Amino acid sequence: MAKIIAFDEEARRGLERGMNQLADAVKVTLGPKGRNVVLEKKWGAPTITNDGVSIAKEIELEDPYEKIGAELVKEVAKKTDDVAGDGTTTATVLAQALVREGLRNVAAGANPMALKRGIEKAVEAVSSALLEQAKDVETKEQIASTASISAADTQIGELIAEAMDKVGKEGVITVEESQTFGLELELTEGMRFDKGYISAYFATDMERMEASLDDPYILIVNSKIGNVKDLLPLLEKVMQSGKPLLIIAEDVEGEALSTLVVNKIRGTFKSVAVKAPGFGDRRKAMLGDIAILTGGTVISEEVGLKLENAGLDLLGRARKVVITKDETTIVDGAGDTDQVNGRVAQIRAEIENSDSDYDREKLQERLANVAGGVAVIKAGAATEVELKERKHRIEDAVRNAKAAVEEGIVAGGGVALLQASSVFEKLELEGDEATGAAAVKLALEAPLKQIAVNGGLEGGVVVEKVRNLSVGHGLNAATGQYVDMIAEGILDPAKVTRSALQNAASIAALFLTTEAVIADKPEKAAAAAPGGMPGGDMDF
């Protein structure tokens, strides 16, 4: 396909026009009085949202240079969302301000590479200042405040704080659609996986159709069990101990299954067989997780262990196991704490190294099962459009709350960024590097200005007022009052604010150092087919 090329100022201005169109659509959502944006969908009802990354993803521009500019800013929003789960609108506003100020200096003759170095040094100094300002999250109320701001709903914030309190910071909080109106929280203690009993005859409570085993032995096998002769030596040892048995295997079938069922029905021996969760390598990993959590060993011929030779020392233990037809929950596994912590560290390292969103999600589920627990927030709404929007807000708020626990909290509402500009007094830069740092200092005002504008106030006046207030004091845009932001619960996770600034600066540096843009040449629309002859579709 033929290409078109733009150079110098023409190239940079083309990129800037695209960035401005995207940023102007996104920034109207910033702050407590930010508006919503309606997104048309090819199928189904339109989506109404105030989430920056969702809006950015929908924008496709016609002009090839503008399209590239918009795509670069989409990357800012996406990267911030991936890392911190929130702050996408702030990142977009910062990027727009940095690029605008930087391009003005480039047009005036500043060296783009020196500007880039100045921007990078300034951003590093501000990021360090933000982390120094950050206060550790100490109370459930602080988590609730942070999540409430992200979701623009105090009920959602309180529910997320409740969920995090129950499952811990490593636990998984998932959001599901509910058929009922309102919000519900469902908690699962211990490890849960989505495989239930192989036969309904294993149920111990026929009314609820679930099997409950107290203080059972747990046999973990990475293969099918069909021959009862392989299982008998171990069954006899477990029966002598007087404890029930949970068997987790690829499958239990044939005479092995019928022997277990018959003994359960007669009351001779209490046991339950369930299929192993997952497939392939993921199944091996999950069986390993169960073994470490329960203090058992995976019996697999790959490591030279055979079922017929297995003793009680290879079995895991737990305080309680509850099995339904769809899922199994293991409570208080008897695994060694050091081994469990080692497994947690290993899974966390795999998450950091994974490039696939799907793999990362599955690894997060494994991490939650090993380290914490699982909480499910069920969200309902009057219409499908509202339900989608609400679910998305809750997912963002969950990630926001986790970011707050990770790196602490700073004053929200754009105040932390503005007041971090005090670090510029200590920066000793000269020439165009100093000009680059000055562009960052000016850009730090942009989020607060935009929040004020969206609240119907004069941005410049608000910035000057907040600049002269004590550290941590700023504008509560919801009421128009100047308050102590942290005392009022107007908080942002330090990780969100820091990521927004770093990602915005990264893209701004690319804009400023661009000297040429190469894009696909737009194809001319094909000429329409000529119309038929008069009466050409009539029968004679």
From Swiss-Prot:
Keywords, ordered alphabetically: ATP-binding, Chaperone, Cytoplasm, Isomerase, Nucleotide-binding
One Gene Ontology cellular component annotation held by this UniProt entry: cytoplasm
Residues annotated as binding ATP are 29-32, 86-90, 413, 476-478, 492
Question: InterPro entries this protein is in?
Answer: Chaperonin_Cpn60_CS (IPR018370), Cpn60/GroEL (IPR001844), Cpn60/GroEL/TCP-1 (IPR002423), GroEL-like_apical_dom_sf (IPR027409), GROEL-like_equatorial_sf (IPR027413), TCP-1-like_intermed_sf (IPR027410)
Task: Report whether Chaperone shows up as a keyword of the record.
Answer: yes
First-level EC class: isomerase
**The keyword Transport is assigned to this record:** no
The UniProt record lists the EC number as 5.6.1.7
Subcellular localization, as worded in the UniProt entry = Cytoplasm
Which transformation does this protein catalyse, written as a reaction? ATP + H2O + a folded polypeptide = ADP + phosphate + an unfolded polypeptide
Task: Give any GO molecular function from the UniProt entry.
Answer: ATP binding
Which GO terms fall under biological process for this protein? protein refolding
As for family, the record states: Belongs to the chaperonin (HSP60) family.
Q: What does this protein do?
A: Together with its co-chaperonin GroES, plays an essential role in assisting protein folding. The GroEL-GroES system forms a nano-cage that allows encapsulation of the non-native substrate proteins and provides a physical environment optimized to promote and accelerate protein folding.
**Subunit structure of this entry?**
Forms a cylinder of 14 subunits composed of two heptameric rings stacked back-to-back. Interacts with the co-chaperonin GroES.
Among NCBIfam families, the record links this protein to:
GroEL, PRK00013.1, PRK12849.1, PRK12850.1, PRK12851.1
Name of this chain's protein: Chaperonin GroEL 2
